């Protein structure tokens, strides 16, 4: 049984989900401002919706540990940005539920783990990424 089938069995109302990061993924990195829309993002998210996926937008902006006074305002800021650019989405993670349950995560800062690559492969990719940042 694949992971999404296990999730569906445990949570009957679950819909296959893509969780997409906001800063650096949907828009160019400009925090605390909102950057320009990334090229192709609108088409990509329309594609995921057409495939039947639920779209959840996630952002560290909504993490109340980073700034407890403004994290809820960030949900509104993200929603306004998405509406302004006519970006399709189902919900914005408000940071209250913990990690978003999703089948796929799209993020500009992710390093993907696979059993084939293993942890040595993750370390190698990590080292390459931090060397690019220096």
Where are these regions (language model features)?
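HAD-like aspartate-dependent phosphatase fold
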Residues: 1-134
């Amino acid at each position: 049984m694949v992971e999404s089938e296990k999730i569906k069995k445990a949570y009957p109302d679950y819909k296959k989900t893509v969780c997409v990061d906001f800063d650096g993924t949907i828009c160019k990195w400009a925090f605390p401002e909102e950057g320009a829309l990334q090229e192709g993002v609108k088409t990509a998210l329309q594609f995921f919706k057409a495939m039947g996926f639920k779209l959840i937008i996630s952002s560290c902006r909504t993490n109340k540990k980073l700034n407890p006074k403004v994290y809820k305002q960030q949900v509104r800021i993200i929603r306004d940005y998405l509406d302004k650019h006519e970006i399709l989405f189902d919900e914005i993670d408000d940071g209250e539920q913990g990690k978003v349950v999703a089948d796929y995560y799209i993020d500009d800062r992710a390093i993907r783990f696979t059993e084939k690559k293993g942890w040595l492969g993750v370390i190698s990719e990590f080292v390459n990424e931090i060397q690019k940042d220096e």
